[in-house]
Amino acid sequence: EHRAFTFSRILYESDRREPGGQGWYTDYPTADQNLMIRLSEMTTTKVGFDKYDEPDHVVLRLTDEKLFDYPFIFMSDVGTLWLDDLEASRLGDYLRKGGFLWVDDFWGPHAWTQWMTQIGKALPSGEYPVFDIPFEHPIHRVVYTVNEIPQIPSIQHWRRSGGRTTSERGRRSEEV
């Protein structure tokens, strides 16, 4: 029997504060719960629910003994991420052993540089280069056909801008 999918968010330290950013807890816990509900509604993935009938989700540190119990982990707003040596080593081990990491919700060239520096501690870029997945790749058609890859703004930015732009962090953040 397969166990139910549990959304696993990583708690991490930030190296600075950022206007509008909230670090690891950006949109927590509602985003985690909503994603799990939609996953159960739109796919055949079995999702776990707790005793209050809320989607099961956990918050872990990279140093947590249970990290390797979860094949999928999520990190939000990684443009302020700071990994110490032990955390970087654990993340690298997790990924090399087949763990899946989804990162989301960071904007602009400064945040991208910060992320690349930190992930480079876990997976050196010479051995593990980061690259864009070509639009023609089958991953864009596994469950649904993806016709375009838009930049999705935060709901707060959408409200503030009246839906005029997706850029939270300046004109170049739409490209990075």
Regions from the PLM with identified roles:
Residues 1-72, 76-79:
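Aromatic-Pro/Gly-enriched surface loop or interdomain linker
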Residues 1-3, 64-69, 94-96, 124, ...:
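Extracellular/periplasmic catalytic domains that process cell-envelope and extracellular macromolecules
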Residues 7, 67-113:
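Short alpha-beta junction capping motif
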Residues 12, 62-64, 69, 85, ...:
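Generic structural "secondary-structure junction" signal
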Residues 15-19, 110-176:
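An acidic, glycine-rich "communication" segment
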Residues 30-34, 38, 86, 90, ...:
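Extracytoplasmic/secreted proteins, especially bacterial periplasmic and envelope-associated proteins
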Residues 40, 99, 120-124:
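Hydrophobic/aromatic-lined pockets within catalytic cores
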Residues 45-61, 103-108, 127-136:
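Surface-exposed patches in mature extracellular/periplasmic domains of secreted proteins
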